[in-house]
A protein has these predicted regions:
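Non-catalytic cap/lid and distal C-terminal segments of serine-dependent acyl enzymes
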Residues: 1-169
């Protein structure tokens, strides 16, 4: 397995704001860099299996938000997704990403594994999102790191829970 850790904190003009449009501007140029530059460079440099069945993406905090933005708009490239304390606030599972979550059979057949984790002492909305996805019929695995906050120990535990489920198909 090749693990690539890139910072999604790509600097670009950022207008800010608390609404979803303003928040989505933050690091927005990262998506182009990831899809057009980073993935092709990794596939050229390392011996990879470059199909979607052998590609996963996960992120912590804002990287969890970016993971959802990338994976659920590029299911042709990814089949595993993980968000560790993902900043995925107020996601309307019926509307977002072209309404993909309102088609659970499609999500469940295309996404081999979906994981959401968080610390027990933080409120990133992970529990609500897991419940909403399950109510919609989407298969999702969840993990709560007992006694931890929005911190590295949480994310290390999430990684440990996530990785064993990758590339089992």
């Amino acid at each position: 397995m090749v693990v690539v850790m890139e910072s999604g904190d790509v600097k670009a003009p950022f207008r800010g704001g608390s609404n979803e449009a303003g928040r989505s501007d933050y690091g927005a140029t990262f998506y182009k860099v990831l899809l057009n530059d980073l993935i092709p460079m990794v596939d050229r440099t390392f011996r990879t299996l470059s199909d979607r069945d052998h590609r996963a993406m996960a992120g912590l905090s804002w990287g969890g938000h970016q993971t959802f933005d990338v994976v659920f708009t590029h299911l042709d490239l990814f089949s595993y997704a993980g968000a560790f304390s993902g900043a995925i606030f107020g996601l309307d599972v019926n509307q977002t990403y072209g309404g993909i979550f309102s088609r659970p059979a499609e999500v469940n057949s295309r996404l081999h594994y979906l994981f959401l984790g968080c610390g027990s002492e933080e409120d990133m909305g992970t529990g609500r999102l897991v419940a909403d996805l399950r109510r919609a019929g989407v298969r999702v695995d969840s993990y709560v790191s007992v006694g931890t906050h929005h911190e590295w120990l949480t994310w290390r535990r999430c990684l440990r829970a996530f990785v064993p489920h990758l590339f089992k198909r």
